[in-house]
């Protein structure tokens, strides 16, 4: 078998992308296309009393202005986000009192109320983008402002203005999980108890490529063609068809190169449906590309979780039980409950905690909807348990590393069922710690601390273990075609946005089929070709796609033996396959794939294979962060960062390392500078541009020391877990622990994210002043 899996092969797609040959949505244009601009609400909550579009329609070039009333007349349906997780292993989230969950319909344009700042209320179609923007400026909307709430905790406490009249209390999810009786008994008998509350703030993805769509309607075929970058074209096709009130085969979605996702592109946006609908009404293709300011107002956002956690321990420091109350802010409507659904069952982290309960709540507020953002829900709960362990170690006067070691699940205990019921299939958590400490030169930290002190700096070292649960949409399909021209086509329904799928998927197919990686072409993104696929999210792509490619390749090899037996005039039982060739056992007679394809009926050497996997996998790792702080200014320098990740079997270690680098920076961004900030008095955004929303740059971080500790998962034939999210999961806790460690001499015990220099300086001053 040709060795391709596990090799650090350079990415096949890079030359195309680096030479400007990428196919991003805004790169496409259509003859006679027109442009769409969006009129957005200036209020976080208001009733729409009326709309005057006369001034806009009279402007040169304006072809039409469409409103929520027009949507209702044309019977456009709400976007079917289906926010509740659906796999066999997901939590059964319910509403208060075990009621059905109210999700808040997401109309393309509302006709009654706006429920968050920046919500679309009308669209203007014009000959040029400038004319469309001019028209949007003069659409006059009459609003009656309504009381609003944007605070997560306040929404959960009740008494805030209802976002939806159908749900006066604003709490749409309220479910509890775990062993309540066992937890209470452990709390009653414990020697020590620690409790803390944390807020993991709201952030947004800021993908390099702004949201864009080009839609056209063909009246002769009664069919829509929609170019739209996404996390999965198949899902977009299905949901847009429902919005437009047509059959799925009347919609074609094309999603080729995508300039960043991070979860923000995995759900349908109203602009996609609006452009398609407007194309039908105007009779011409319609194009829309968001600008960065619009993105800050209307891209789905992430995180925004309040959690209160309590941990009890015995006299020796062994964990006995944990209790958590997680409150997720879903914004103005439920686009996804993934953050609360995925995070809550992992509240115990990598640790042996015999009993636990978690209350999982989700609330509506007058904010942009939140969505599954890179490592959805897991960085939040990892932050909570890793910060709580540091607090417990301080209160018990124990070494925090020793406290972790004492309570980590041992490899001999695998597979391990955690107290909420998740079944960890594999992992060597102690080994992760040992490898990370060696790579980080843990024993040299005191020397570095003294050196920093001599320069007037405070050195801090932070530690975090993490474990994730990766599953995602359970169905994936591939089609493999051996082409007589001398290449292989692999059609797959995932959607890359920088992950290197064209290379890593090709490595799997190449090794199984015994062919060079360069022979394999990955086909994605056109729903006229890709019929089934779950897209890219939740760390699913390599595992789901790799598994179904292997299954299909195995069956294709068996078919190849049948064809080879005919060509070589031998019995099928005498045909063996090795290194891309079919050989008659004990002879030198053989034939390769492409010769077989040339000599067999067209299409015979092809296969369509589907697979369904409901079993999650559990990537895990250890991160160590080192910082230096200037106590006079609060300035922070990130000096060292080490990550050890168990991604299962790494198909391409170089690509995995690249994913880890990006994920670490994304997590550090939240910990250091990123925050969606709203004015509590007016509800207006204070972080609506890249001048105001902090983003880390390459110069803000050191060279990372990244290592792999590959423990294959037994749940799939390749042993894959996931490699795209671990850096984001561990880094916020590791960084915050480093900051608190640096400030321990002042008695600082916690600092909220983002730990900006101003926030650090204030913590020092407050500690000095008692």
PLM region spans:
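Thiamine diphosphate
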Residues: 261-283, 287-289, 501-509
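Flexible, low-hydrophobicity surface segments
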Residues: 1-169, 193, 271, 281
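Active-site-proximal alpha-helical scaffold in enzymes
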Residues: 125-129, 270-277, 307-318
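Short acidic, glycine/serine/threonine-rich loops at helix termini
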Residues: 76-80, 135-138, 237-239, 262-268, ...
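Helix-loop-helix junctions that connect adjacent transmembrane helices in secondary transporters/permeases
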Residues: 160-244, 410-487, 686-707
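A glycine- and small-aliphatic-rich helix-loop capping segment at beta-alpha/alpha-beta transitions
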Residues: 231-233, 241-245, 267-278, 304, ...
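C-terminal catalytic domains of large/alpha subunits in multi-subunit enzymes
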Residues: 59, 68-69, 87-91, 99-100, ...
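Glycine-rich loop/linker segments at domain edges
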Residues: 7, 13-16, 82, 87-102, ...
């Amino acid at each position: 078998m040709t060795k391709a899996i596990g090799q650090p092969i350079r990415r096949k797609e890079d030359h195309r992308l680096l030479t400007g040959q990428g196919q991003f949505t805004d790169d496409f244009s259509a003859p006679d296309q027109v442009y769409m601009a969006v009129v957005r609400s200036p209020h976080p909550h208001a009733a729409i009393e009326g709309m005057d579009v006369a001034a806009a329609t009279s402007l040169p070039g304006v072809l039409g202005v469409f409103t929520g009333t027009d949507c209702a007349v044309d019977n456009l349906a709400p976007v079917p986000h289906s926010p509740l997780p659906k796999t066999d292993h997901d939590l059964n989230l319910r509403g208060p009192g075990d009621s059905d969950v109210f999700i808040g319909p997401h109309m393309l344009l509302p006709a009654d109320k706006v429920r968050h700042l920046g919500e679309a209320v009308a669209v203007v179609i014009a000959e040029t983008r400038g004319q469309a923007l001019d028209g949007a400026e003069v659409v006059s909307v009459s609003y009656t402002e309504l009381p609003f709430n944007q605070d997560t905790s306040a929404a959960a406490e009740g008494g805030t203005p209802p976002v939806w009249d159908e749900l006066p209390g604003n709490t749409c999810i309220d479910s509890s999980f775990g062993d309540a009786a066992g937890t209470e008994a452990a709390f009653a008998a414990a020697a020590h108890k620690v409790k803390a509350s944390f807020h993991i703030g709201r952030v947004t993805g800021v993908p390099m490529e702004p949201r864009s769509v080009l839609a056209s309607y063909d009246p002769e075929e009664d069919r829509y063609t929609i170019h739209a970058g996404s996390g999965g074209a198949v899902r977009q096709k299905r949901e847009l068809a429902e919005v437009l009130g047509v059959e799925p085969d009347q919609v074609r979605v094309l999603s080729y190169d995508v300039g960043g996702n991070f979860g923000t592109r995995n759900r349908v946006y109203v602009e996609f449906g609006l452009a398609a609908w407007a194309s039908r009404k105007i009779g011409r293709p319609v194009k829309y590309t968001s600008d960065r300011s619009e993105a800050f107002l209307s891209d789905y956002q992430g995180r925004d979780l309040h959690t209160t956690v309590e941990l009890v321990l015995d006299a020796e420091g062994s964990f006995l039980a944990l209790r958590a109350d997680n409150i997720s802010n879903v914004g103005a409507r439920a686009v996804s409950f993934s953050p609360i659904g995925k995070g809550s069952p992992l509240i115990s982290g990598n640790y042996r905690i015999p009993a636990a309960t978690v209350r999982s709540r989700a609330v509506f507020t007058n904010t942009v909807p939140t969505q599954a953002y890179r490592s959805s829900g897991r960085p939040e709960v990892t932050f909570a348990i890793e910060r709580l362990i540091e607090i417990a170690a301080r209160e018990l006067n124990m070494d925090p590393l020793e406290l972790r070691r004492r309570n980590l699940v041992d490899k001999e205990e695998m597979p391990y069922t955690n107290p909420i019921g998740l079944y960890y299939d594999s992992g060597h958590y102690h080994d992760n710690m040992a490898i990370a400490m060696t790579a980080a030169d843990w024993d040299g930290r005191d020397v570095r601390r003294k050196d920093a002190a001599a320069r007037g700096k405070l050195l801090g070292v932070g530690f975090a273990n993490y474990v994730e649960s990766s599953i995602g949409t359970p169905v994936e399909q591939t089609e493999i075609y051996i082409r007589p021209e001398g290449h292989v086509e692999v059609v797959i329904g995932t959607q890359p946005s920088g992950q290197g799928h064209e290379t890593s998927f090709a490595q799997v197919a190449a090794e199984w089929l015994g062919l060079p990686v360069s022979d394999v072409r990955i086909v994605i993104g056109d729903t006229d070709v890709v019929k089934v696929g779950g897209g890219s999210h939740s760390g699913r792509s390599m595992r789901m796609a790799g598994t179904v490619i292997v299954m299909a390749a195995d069956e294709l090899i068996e078919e190849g033996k049948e064809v080879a037996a005919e060509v070589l005039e031998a019995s099928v039982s005498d045909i063996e396959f090795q290194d891309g060739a079919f050989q008659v056992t004990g002879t030198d007679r053989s034939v390769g794939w492409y010769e077989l394809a040339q000599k067999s009926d067209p299409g015979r050497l092809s296969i369509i294979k589907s697979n369904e996997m409901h079993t999650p996998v559990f990537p895990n790792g250890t991160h160590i962060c080192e910082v230096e702080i200037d106590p006079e200014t609060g300035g922070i320098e990130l000096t060292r960062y080490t990550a050890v990740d168990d991604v299962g079997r790494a198909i391409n270690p170089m690509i995995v390392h690249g994913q880890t680098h990006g994920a670490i920076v994304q997590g550090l961004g939240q910990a250091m500078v990123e925050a969606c900030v709203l004015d509590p008095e007016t509800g207006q955004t204070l972080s609506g541009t890249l001048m105001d929303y902090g983003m880390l740059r390459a110069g803000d971080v050191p060279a990372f020391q990244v290592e792999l500790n590959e423990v294959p998962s037994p749940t799939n034939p390749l042993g894959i877990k996931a490699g795209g999210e671990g850096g984001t999961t561990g880094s916020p806790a590791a960084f915050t622990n480093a900051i608190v460690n640096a400030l321990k001499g002042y008695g600082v015990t916690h600092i909220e994210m983002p730990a900006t220099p101003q926030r650090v300086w204030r913590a020092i001053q407050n500690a000095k002043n008692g």
